[in-house]
């Protein structure tokens, strides 16, 4: 989903945030940010359990040739015979009888995103996948949902050169000879229990053939998603790079304005929000943005105007809003005279708000306006500064004349009490009370204070120019006593106060949109719901003979005490605010969405909306893929994986390539998330001068085990291999490097280098290294290095002494740690990998 863009000529800078405590940082590590589940009609009807009948049914549904059926049945018998491996992670939690081995999500593969069923299309829109194709960042795209590829496309110029990029099922149908020649030759069914399982029940995946001499310079890309609970995904990828060709295949399991409330109370257009910025969630607290998505909308936009007209915002139909339906809290009295049904205030205050799709939210329903709960700033300012800032917002300006700085405050000549208040504050803060100029014919009293420090303080914390004024992060994070003092001074200078029915009504006007909404946010902290109304200028005007340019004026109004308006109800941590108007329009424009750390929400004009996020179920799912690659003489293949499965997935993958004479095979592997990952990309170097390389990084959080590594078999002379493995563990997580380098007899002149580096964030995590080196030839160069380390306090001290915060210092250390892998990725994926690890590590001190 998403929000429509707000045009903005200038973008405010991201707010400065206090570093997370170690406990907060560690609690946030390893959090999986894509845990929504779509409707699951197909999965609900799928058969559980594995048997010969299930295997025959899969083959029949795909109308496969008999040789493939026989291959599947043979593999099933091997799977039944082989025991669960005990040498690695604990796999006892896998219940093979409870898994759904085939779920068909759509009857027909789509050639365009628009042809996909709406629920599946929305999923990939949320993940931002079509955008990469639109921007020509990839040469071809495949998207697998459940058991089958639902979308497939390849660039026409590559197709004309003979490049084949199909889903594996279509590859079997359309190119049976090539398929049969290579299928199972690199990874036979008998290799291990899970390769046997995959061979028996495989479905989906990618089939790629690159003709001799053809170079595919832009990556081919595939996305895999499990939506169904207890689903097993068993894609089979087969890549053949013919002689002298090159291809880069990228596989990913993670994704790629309205005014959004940032953590300092500022409002910024959604398109200006960046990864790493802090926004306010529906709990009122600051949370990090972990991803920004954009797509083109061709559909309905819903605009909601709450009780506060300037807070109106627009969202797409499916975007969840935090709301309370009026029908659930209304009294039994009938609606009359155009008024909505009255509500029972007790029911409303005790009702539990819930996430409801925008299209299902009606006029009269209640939206949730959370009360901000910012992190208190470590610098506590005196109340005199609060009063001075309040008067400056209302009546002050900072003046720089001939290099001389001053603060000037303009009051009515009758407001001498406020004049003295300003002078006393300046005297206390800057030891200067300034001068007062009374001009009776203008009914004015002007205070001028020459102060360099005061000028800088107001400039930096409140701003210069009436329409540009807003409070800094430092001021917004002061306590309620400070803010109440500031608001009272502001009302003294620029407000109107009346009393009706025992309530005090307060109203102020400002030309600064940002200050108007900051004030609304501050008042919510103080227990008052304020409305904001925009008044457009009527055109140029003349005041006392001078032409003036009129600007938009924002009126902010609220009540204190007595029997004020009760349409918005104070519900403790939030206000329940009624929707006054709901409108729908057809839109053809870009829309944006943010992924935000738990609680997965942000505020649009102060109101709670949900970020769109891959499903997390209480029971486990199984991902058991097989990737076979044949690299012909002098060809080169690079295979990049960035996986971010939810922490209920067993991720058990067999990946192996055969590199022939002069060929190069490169595996770039990033593993984040999952319950258990067991993955060891391998290269069998069967021809002279073949090269194999594995660069991998793994992150293990609480209750996660990343058992990863590599296998290199030197089967011919003058072959070379390189393994670089990086791992990070925290919160009791475990990482393991498990590797094999084998140099067979006759593979003289071979060279191999292995480097394993592990980083432990805390004292409860674990890292293991299980290297196995088998050298059967004399003329061999072999190097192995393994390190386990914590983030050094000396490193942090050195960086912080250069002006970095603890957060920034930690982030720099982590970036350097993963840099050997990140630099090998395409730019978008390097940023994504760095983002995932860097944000998770931020604030955690080893």
From Swiss-Prot:
Gene3D superfamilies for this protein: Hedgehog/Intein (Hint) domain, Homing endonucleases
NCBIfam families in the cross-refs: intein_Cterm, sufB
Molecular function terms, GO-annotated: endonuclease activity
GO biological process: intein-mediated protein splicing; intron homing; iron-sulfur cluster assembly
Keywords assigned by UniProt, alphabetized: Autocatalytic cleavage, Endonuclease, Hydrolase, Intron homing, Nuclease, Protein splicing
Listed PROSITE patterns: INTEIN_C_TER, INTEIN_ENDONUCLEASE, INTEIN_N_TER
Further comment: Was identified as a high-confidence drug target.
Similarity field: Belongs to the iron-sulfur cluster assembly SufBD family.
Protein's recorded name: Iron-sulfur cluster assembly SufBD family protein Rv1461
Record PTM text: This protein undergoes a protein self splicing that involves a post-translational excision of the intervening region (intein) followed by peptide ligation.
Top enzyme class: hydrolase
InterPro entries, per the entry: Fe-S_cluster_assembly_SufBD (IPR055346), Hint_dom_C (IPR003586), Hint_dom_N (IPR003587), Hint_dom_sf (IPR036844), Homing_endonucl (IPR027434), INTEIN (IPR006142), Intein_C (IPR030934), Intein_endonuc_central (IPR004042)
EC number assigned by the record: 3.1.-.-
PANTHER family linked: FES CLUSTER ASSEMBLY PROTEIN SUF (PTHR30508), UPF0051 PROTEIN ABCI8, CHLOROPLASTIC-RELATED (PTHR30508:SF1)
Chain segments carrying region Disordered: 1-20
Span of domain DOD-type homing endonuclease: 388-528
Recorded GO CC terms: cytosol
